[in-house]
Swiss-Prot record:
Record's subunit section: The RNAP catalytic core consists of 2 alpha, 1 beta, 1 beta' and 1 omega subunit. When a sigma factor is associated with the core the holoenzyme is formed, which can initiate transcription.
Protein name: DNA-directed RNA polymerase subunit beta
Organism: Rickettsia prowazekii (strain Madrid E)
Chemical reaction(s) catalysed: RNA(n) + a ribonucleoside 5'-triphosphate = RNA(n+1) + diphosphate
Gene designation per UniProt: rpoB
EC number: 2.7.7.6
């Protein structure tokens, strides 16, 4: 067999990755999890359960909804529709086709349903199966997720953002004393289900307990307890302990001594031991719980109390006459002096009373006695009247309503999470499958609420991440599906009842449009389905990892208070404390931390390393916020010796509530995995983050997402080590799917022969078509460039092509530039930035932006619109860029106003004069009955046409241009097919030759005689077809050849079939919107060079606008003649406190000078002045042991590595574990630079040195997408507002600049009366005046007259709307 590893370069491509000098001290035991798995797991694994056999699907997501909705039965129970299984067909169009054709990337959902028809005997009521019909029913197209975790909806890429909401369960809290004027705490409890009615319990100022359902009118809590079937006696027994008072003759009453019921107070009567009669404490003396416990310990069991003590106590059972058994007082009643007299008179020996004291209040008893309802029926009717006001209350309706509210699984669902939270809070042990409320739940909620009021236990923290959970994309769409299926269920029941069930098939009953419309609505209009932020790869990743507290079922930004927005201790390692928007959404929209993941219950988990007996292990455990509270967790930078033992007498640990304690090493349970786990992806890309103020770090995180991809990408010299992970997970770069060898490479595609053999031993071929100059959602340019060469050996998941904003597999949002911190003639006042002309000349910050323009030719009432070059009243000059069809050529340079696509629209006929008739007769019909409706380049846009796409309706004849584009696409498909076939053929025929050589021929083509032994030369002259004709003696070889032939033919057939399918799809025409005959899309690329007014920023929140571009000769320069690229204001630092940028500048300075030193060493080596060992020694000193494998390689490899760092040495300084000031100094020293990081700088204008040393260094700067070209605009002519007749405002309306109230004051202050009058009349809304002014300008005159502005007429109209008839009387001037 042919070796698959022929001609492989010895090193895999992964060895070409960039090596960074890493300053981190902590060894990583856990890799950063895939950054977009939150999206993919939620939708594909948990919701759709794609690629899982039907029998192996778990009851979750789509499967669980279908199981819960089906079976559906009709009202008479004759027909029954059951769910069997579901599956997805392959999507009609792939991702790229959907993007181009403005379609949704979706797969048809096919659900197998079984319709059972029953025969019911009317006499006996017995049922028999009459017939069963099983059928696969189409339930609509369900959007699929792309490999990057996005959805394509109507051709645009969208992201469904995860939502943070309050977890289902029960929560206890108080009003913080805000409601009642006395500041009294009013406690309340709320049961929040996943789906269903909310149930609230609350205290009022008089300590009566109420409940509400869905925030409606409140009722007494005991009404609810009665409604669930509790009697007065059961209520009192459940919530109170009782104690018995026994009558002791001539002494009073004896009662059991319970020290727990004693609070510190002064005795009003003596404390007497009932058993011995001893006085233990005199009246007036103080008793404390501790003293009470002491007496109890020495045998005090019962004490004597006076008769009066019983007054004010509450009975714990009915008080009965011993003789007649007549009820004298009911349970719960208060003992009064009259009742005590009756007790004494009737010689009742034992009286049972409730234990009500400061530790156990009388709230339930008081509520019972305030409540008028005495039985279950009355309570249910009372609840019914509140929920259904106006409807007559009967017991059946009331019972049914109450049951449906909380105990019916179809209408009420706590969810598994809700049940777990409920069980843990109420200390119950109810099965997790019970997702409705139970009687025990309600009883215990009231019990805990009362205990809180009594000062036992603590309230819940709503902002604790154990009480907030994440609803990811799968769950959000699951909820929409449920809504759609419930609506569909109603229509199925109606159809069952309406028609003849015997003749109906399942597909007749199901109307899939209901389901499809709900799903479509969610993806198109939901607040959580958002247009993807595609400015650069980082903004994509951040958008997919975003957590929003807004949206349906969440908070609204107007009502969200400070607490919800604030950072909470449980955010540690779960939600980034830095990255959140500035403005009204601050704290409501967050980003997940780098290492965080979401568990099956929707709670965010963070990883920790387990510590056993003071030794740190490599076992990584993910803990949620609830679990984390049980442990003591040390920091990642805790000192550890070589064996992993924690060093030091005490370790600083985090415990529940966000507090820190010092504990011994043996008591530590876990330590953090890495300090980076605290922050999000964007924040982890900021080097020296630990030296920046948090507010500026927030701006830095947010502005990195606005960086525009540049033409020339460059990774930062000073990075954090995360750059590669971001580039890989974002999907911007192209990853190898399998191990393989690169066969062909050009700028458009990469062809790789894989090393993973099929069953037949043949290789498969991977073809990667690269994206070239595609438009992103934010009009930035998506372009991929290959990194591999022919013959390279690549491993699976190696990066083989760079995408936008990536450089050699690392994210590269900006450029490394030489900056100096220096004031320069006031041009860097207020954060302005001064740049050198070199930056513009060499396209350092030049970016390409692509705009899309679309024109649709429709079928109108008067006839079809036509795309044509033949446009009335348009000069040949204006048509110079159009082809014969009327569509612009690719490559044409266009500016505002140019025609992109010529189009004419029929216009309605109007009566014509004899002269027009004559003209028509001479010049033909065309020009008169159509009007020009061509697509022009809008104002402010210019550039090069890079692509034209034409879509024609099915059945409409294609024009020449469309056929030419189609031909190009077919040629591309054919090339892919031919290349793949060629690689397979090369392999198959090499293998065939190897099998045949050395064997004796029995039969073969004419030029070969039988009986010969086959040689390689003999086979060279044969065609591929003739090779198959050869037969040899060895039967095993012939069997193998036959197998190869079968597999080869199958492969060839599959390739041809795939090719013909794609060609048919191209030629068949397109699905266009209603009434559209043809759609033409034109893409214009614009090069934006850096210019004054553009916004730039660093990674530390240091932003500014370019104020001036200075010629290179005027810029400050170094002593060696190097000109500084950018001059920044030193005053931008002290008050902003983002010192990280200075450390970055110093390390960047070291990077450049180390690179110079390495280049010098290489030059000296090439000139034979030094040995390779000198270079090795220097590299070892710089990088340490990280590059041993390179130093052990050949001299060529070492020199090749040195050449890669000739522009700058790459550093990684991980956040919170990076380079310290001393490390920066060490690098500067190694580079032979002053440790201050400052140099002598020469002024380019005078040639003299500046007075003092200046901080200079390489810094990473970004160009943000706030470009001056898209902001600045001025109005010449344009539209006016209809009512006020004033010019409109804003760039999109081609509006003017408003001369507002304050500007009027300015003119008034200067007394510029005529200027003011002109501004308020002819330059604004004096309609006649401005027409006359225009006329006078045309005539060359300078005079104008002001009339009445339209706003005056508007004011008069408003007076009249107030019934004040104001008239303007104009007196003629004399």
């Amino acid at each position: 067999m042919v070796s698959l590893r022929d001609n492989i370069e010895s090193q895999p491509l992964s060895h070409n990755r960039r090596i960074r000098k890493n300053f981190g001290h902590i060894n990583l035991v856990a890799d950063i999890p895939n950054l977009i798995e939150i999206q993919k797991n939620s939708y594909e694994k948990n919701f759709l359960q794609l690629n899982i056999k039907d029998s192996e699907r778990k009851n979750k997501g789509l499967q669980s909804i279908l199981n819960s909705i089906f079976p559906i039965s009709d009202s008479s129970n004759i027909a029954n529709l059951e769910f069997v299984k579901y599956e997805f067909d392959t999507p009609k169009y792939d991702v790229d086709e959907c993007s181009q054709r403005s379609l949704s990337y979706a797969a048809p959902l096919k659900v197998t349903l079984r319709l059972s028809i029953w025969d019911i005997d009317e006499d006996t009521g017995t049922r028999e199966i009459k017939g069963i019909k099983e059928q696969e029913v189409y339930m609509g197209d369900i959007p699929l997720m792309t490999k990057n975790g996005t959805f394509i909806i109507n051709g645009t890429e969208r992201v469904v953002v995860s939502q943070m909401h309050r977890s289902p369960g029960v929560f206890f809290y108080h009003d913080e004393g805000k409601v009642h004027s006395s500041g009294k705490l009013l406690y309340s409890a709320r049961v929040i289900p996943y789906r269903g009615s909310w149930l609230d319990f609350e205290f009022d100022a008089k300590d009566i307990i109420y409940f509400r359902i869905d925030r409606k009118r409140k009722l007494y809590a005991t009404t609810l307890l009665r409604a669930i079937g509790m009697s007065t006696e059961e209520i009192i027994k459940f919530y109170y302990n009782s104690v018995t008072y026994k009558f002791v003759k001539n002494k009073g009453w004896s009662v059991k001594f319970i020290p727990q019921h004693i609070t510190a107070h002064r005795l009003t009567s003596d404390l007497v031991d009932a058993d011995t009669g001893n006085v233990l404490l005199k009246a007036g003396q103080k008793i404390t719980p501790r003293l009470a416990q002491k007496y109890f310990g020495v045998g005090l069991n019962n004490i004597l109390v006076t008769h009066e003590t019983l007054i004010g106590k509450y009975l714990s059972e009915d008080l009965r006459d011993p003789a007649s058994d007549e009820v004298l007082a009911k349970i719960g009643e208060m003992i009064t002096s009259d009742m005590l007299k009756v007790i004494n008179d009737l010689k009742i020996k034992n009286v049972n009373v409730l234990v009500i004291n400061p530790q156990s209040g009388s709230y339930i008893r008081n509520t019972l006695f305030a409540d008028k309802n005495q039985d279950r029926e009355a309570a249910l009717c009372d609840i019914f009247r509140v929920l259904r006001p106006g409807e007559p209350a009967n017991i059946e309706a009331a019972e049914s309503l109450f049951y449906n509210l909380f105990f019916d699984a179809e209408r009420y669902d706590l969810s598994e999470v809700g049940r777990i939270k409920m069980n843990s809070r109420l200390e119950l042990n109810i099965s997790e499958e019970v997702t409705v409320l139970t009687i025990d739940d309600i009883k215990n909620i009231v019990r805990i609420l009362v205990e809180l009021k009594d000062g036992k236990g603590i309230i819940d923290d709503i902002d604790h991440l154990g009480n907030r959970r994440v609803r990811s994309v799968g769950e959000l769409i699951e909820n929409q599906f449920r809504i759609g299926l419930v609506r569909m269920e109603k229509s199925v029941i109606e159809r069952m009842s309406a028609g003849d069930v015997d003749t109906v098939m399942p597909h007749d009953l199901v109307n899939s449009k209901i389901l499809v419309s709900v799903v479509k609505e969610f993806f198109s209009t939901s607040q959580l389905s958002q247009f993807m932020d595609q400015t650069n790869p980082l903004s994509e990743i951040t958008h997919k990892r975003r957590l929003s507290a807004l949206g349906p079922g969440g908070l609204s930004r107007d009502r969200a208070g400070f607490e919800v927005r604030d950072v909470h201790p449980t955010h540690y390692g779960r939600i980034c404390p830095i990255e959140t928007p500035e403005g009204q959404n601050i704290g409501l929209i967050n980003s997940m931390a780098t290492y965080a993941r979401i568990n099956k219950h929707g709670f965010i988990e963070s990883p920790y390393r387990r510590v056993k007996n003071g030794y740190v292990t490599d076992e990584v455990v993910y803990l949620s916020a609830i679990e984390e509270g049980k442990y003591k967790i040390g920091q990642a930078n805790s000192k550890v010796d070589q064996d992993g033992k924690l060093q030091g007498e005490f370790i600083n640990c985090r415990v529940e509530g966000g507090n820190f304690v010092m504990v011994e090493p043996d008591e530590v349970d876990f330590i953090d995995v890495t300090p980076m786990q605290v922050v999000s992806v964007a924040a982890s890309l900021i080097p020296f983050l630990e030296n920046d103020d948090a507010n500026r770090a927030l701006m830095g995180s947010n502005m990195q997402r606005q960086a525009v991809p540049l033409i020339k990408t460059e990774a930062p010299f000073v990075g954090t080590g995360v750059e590669g992970v971001v580039a890989k997970d974002s999907g911007a770069s192209v990853l190898a799917l399998h191990d393989g060898i690169v066969e062909r490479v050009d700028s458009n595609r990469i062809v790789i022969r894989t090393l993973e053999q099929k069953v037949d031993g043949s290789p498969s071929v991977d073809i990667y078509n690269l994206l070239k100059f595609q438009k992103s959602n934010h009009n930035t340019c998506i372009n991929q460039k290959p990194l591999v060469k022919v013959g390279h050996y690549v491993k699976k998941n190696d990066i083989i092509a760079d995408g936008p904003s990536t450089d050699n597999g690392e994210i590269a949002l900006g450029r490394n530039v030489l900056v100096a911190f220096l004031p320069w003639n006031g041009y860097n006042f207020e954060d302005s930035i001064l740049i050198s002309e070199r930056i513009v000349k060499e396209d350092v910050f030049t970016s390409i932006h692509i705009e899309e323009f679309e024109v649709i030719a429709r079928d109108t009432r008067l006839g079809p619109e036509e795309i044509t070059r033949d446009i009335p009243n348009v000069s040949e000059e204006a048509l110079r860029h159009l082809d014969e069809v009327g569509i612009i050529y690719v490559g044409a340079e266009v500016k505002a106003g140019d025609i992109l696509v010529g189009k004419v629209t029929p216009k309605s006929e109007s009566p014509i004069t004899p002269e027009e008739k004559l003209l028509r007769a001479i010049f033909g019909e065309k020009a008169f009955d159509v009007k020009d409706s061509s697509l022009h380049v809008p104002s402010g846009v210019s550039g090069t046409v890079v692509e034209v796409r034409i879509f024609s309706r099915r059945g409409v004849e294609k024009d020449q241009r469309a056929i030419a584009i189609e031909k190009q696409q077919i040629e591309k498909l054919a090339k892919d097919r031919d290349d793949e076939l060629e690689i397979i053929e090369h392999f198959v025929f090499s293998w065939l030759e190897k099998l045949l050589v050395g064997h004796v021929i029995i039969n073969g083509p004419k030029q070969i005689t039988a009986g010969q032994t086959i040689t390689t030369e003999m086979l060279k002259g044969l065609s591929k077809g003739q090779l198959w004709q050869i037969t040899v003696e060895d039967a095993n070889v012939m069997n193998e050849i036959e197998q190869i032939k079968i597999h080869y033919d199958e492969k060839k057939y599959a390739l041809d079939k795939r090719f013909t399918t794609k060609v048919e799809k191209l030629q068949s025409g397109d699905d266009l919107p209603q009434g559209a005959l043809k759609v033409v899309k034109v893409f214009i690329a614009t090069k934006h060079k850096l210019q004054p007014g553009d916004k730039m920023a660093g990674r530390h929140g240091n932003k500014g606008v370019i104020s001036r571009i200075v010629p290179e000769e005027d810029m400050p320069f170094l002593e060696d003649g190097t000109v500084v690229d950018i001059v920044l204001n030193p005053l931008g630092l002290p008050s902003r406190m983002n010192i990280g940028q200075i450390l970055e500048t110093h390390l960047g300075w070291a990077s450049i000078n180390l690179a110079k030193k390495i280049s010098t060493l290489v030059k000296e080596y090439k000139d034979n002045h030094i040995d390779i060992e000198e270079i090795k020694k220097f590299l070892l000193e710089l990088y340490g042991k990280d590059i041993n494998y390179i130093l052990e390689g050949s001299e060529e490899e070492i020199i090749s590595f040195c050449n890669k760092v000739s522009k700058g040495v790459y550093f990684a300084t991980p956040v919170f574990d990076g380079a310290k000031v001393q490390d920066v100094k060490d690098m500067l020293e190694l580079a032979g630079q002053d440790l201050s990081g400052q140099v002598k700088l020469i002024d380019g204008r005078t040639g003299e040195y500046f007075d003092r040393l200046v901080t200079v260094g390489h810094k990473y700067l970004l160009k943000l997408h706030h470009l001056v070209d898209n902001k600045i605009h001025s109005r010449s002519i344009g539209p006016y507002s209809l009512v006020t007749q004033q010019p409109l405002g804003g760039k999109s309306h081609f509006g003017g600049q408003r001369f507002g109230e304050m500007e009027c004051w300015a003119l008034q202050a200067y007394g510029a009366a005529y200027t003011l009058q002109e501004m308020l009349t002819v330059k604004s809304d004096d309609v006649n005046g401005r027409i006359k002014t225009y006329d006078s300008i045309v005539r060359g005159e300078n005079n104008f007259e002001s009339g009445i502005p339209e706003s005056f007429n508007v004011m008069i109209k408003e007076f009249r709307s107030l019934c004040l008839n104001v008239k303007l009387e104009v007196t003629p001037s004399k």
